[in-house]
Amino acid sequence: MDSNIQNVVIDTNVIVSAFLSSHDDVATVLVLNKLYKNEIRLYYSKEVLAEYKDVLNREKFKFDKREVNRFINYVLEKGIVIEPEKINEELIDKKDLPFYEIVMDKSIKESKLITGNIKHFPVKPFIMTPTEFIKIFGK
């Protein structure tokens, strides 16, 4: 594995924001592009995959099914599924816990959690917004 590739966990809100955006130069779209270009390595769990599928297929978003399938297929083919150790941590939104558990898992070296809901998580240098991630690691 290439040591220059960042290990990441991507919160669902980042994917939703990227899908909703009509601009190619916004941070959420740039993060998704880095993923599709294999410039970042995605880690996920069964719970995270289930949330991706559930949220991205919600009728209210009216996302193109091909785009949703492209993302889910990418996750399944290129992402790395893990079963993280359960953490007894109180987060503002309990649905964020699976993402936090992955980024905190000791088996993943120097992972980053990319989220649009930074306030939902403890303040840690490896938990960042899409804009912060792009500023640090480039487009």
Which residues make up each language-model segment?
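Alpha-helix capping/helix-boundary segments
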Residues: 14-15, 48, 99, 119-120, ...
